[in-house]
């Protein structure tokens, strides 16, 4: 990461050409830049229409200029935003003018958010939530990201850290001043009862992490069945485009194909797999192996059965959770007792019902779930280590209190690593590299 003393600039809006582009500037030279480019510093947080000029007083463009003085800005530094016409030529001219000013340079990925973190405007969970909000494609992803970026999840972790700090303070006070009247007598029982409750709270919270990961990364639905059961046809029908090759030749699908769907606000990752059968062809054998791997990782299996020649591979009947879908409804009489649903990809019959069924299954899984849940592996890892330290502190009742208190300190440190309250330098490059240049 380059020096935070530099003044940086970048395009913060979408790639040109566009109707409007927003260029953000942050750093100690922001006021000087505004004087050079637009003649003076606009009133704080008020929109001002200005002509932007080069150092030779040649006009670049006219647009809206805003100034946000430190510390009341996104980065905590002096920040300016220039809203100009979004042509490549205008942006190139403005960037050339900015780059000519000593001490001013183009920002690197995530540098504005990095400065916001360094200046205490955002913690790491809020930074990650902001990245997720920018990348959100479904309604549930948006809700999860808003909760995280607004500090809802951080507030939970901060409250837990405060409970750990208070517990350590009370135990250490009893250790240091056992004879003092103003130290509550025998606080241990109350402290450890609260730590047991905290351990339970964190355990319940960690158990919800899989839901957070599914909302963020997608609910995996695997289409499986015997060869020619209509798996690829269903993938194409649900995707509303030709993703998979469809032929009457058994074994056409040799690999796992995937498309993303938005069903009722949830990201659904839909996988088409090779037909499950004993194969002699090495390529098809590999496809079958990959299909079985996908089945193991599935959140839901759509078990397709060709109703004109019903055949279910033996190991698929035990797939759980699964929905049995009868296919080729247009070619045979419906056997409603055997199937959860019957469809025809040729006529579209049953496809809206299948989409609703998938949506209902996902909705039931997340019904009543708070969005203040962990959604990243690093959150889970730190929470698990926090729990492990609490387990040691709670279980080792026969050891010195100082040793048990040390485990509380370790537990608090792992909570602090989630929000960045403790040293997490090695994580920062990874986290901020997820952002675009202008964020």
From Swiss-Prot:
What CDD domains does UniProt report for this protein, alphabetically?
trmE (cd04164), TrmE_N (cd14858)
Give residues annotated as binding (6S)-5-formyl-5,6,7,8-tetrahydrofolate.
24, 81, 121, 439
Cellular component terms (Gene Ontology): cytoplasm
The record lists K(+) as bound by 228, 247, 249, 252
Q: Which residues does the annotation say bind GTP?
A: 228-233, 247-253, 272-275
Cofactor binding note from Swiss-Prot or TrEMBL: Binds 1 potassium ion per subunit.
Q: Which GO terms describe its molecular function?
A: GTP binding; GTPase activity; metal ion binding
Protein EC: 3.6.-.-
- The TrmE-type G domain covers 218-363
Name any Gene Ontology BP term.
tRNA methylation
Q: What domain of life does the UniProt record list for this protein's source?
A: Bacteria
Where is this protein primarily located?
cytoplasm
State the compartments where it is located.
Cytoplasm
UniProt-annotated binding residues for Mg(2+):
232, 253
- Please report which protein family the annotation says this sequence is part of: Belongs to the TRAFAC class TrmE-Era-EngA-EngB-Septin-like GTPase superfamily. TrmE GTPase family.
Q: Write down the NCBIfam families for this protein, in alphabetical order.
A: mnmE_trmE_thdF, PRK05291.1-3, small_GTP
List the HAMAP family.
GTPase_MnmE
Q: How does it assemble?
A: Homodimer. Heterotetramer of two MnmE and two MnmG subunits.
- Spell out the protein name for this chain: tRNA modification GTPase MnmE
Gene designation? mnmE
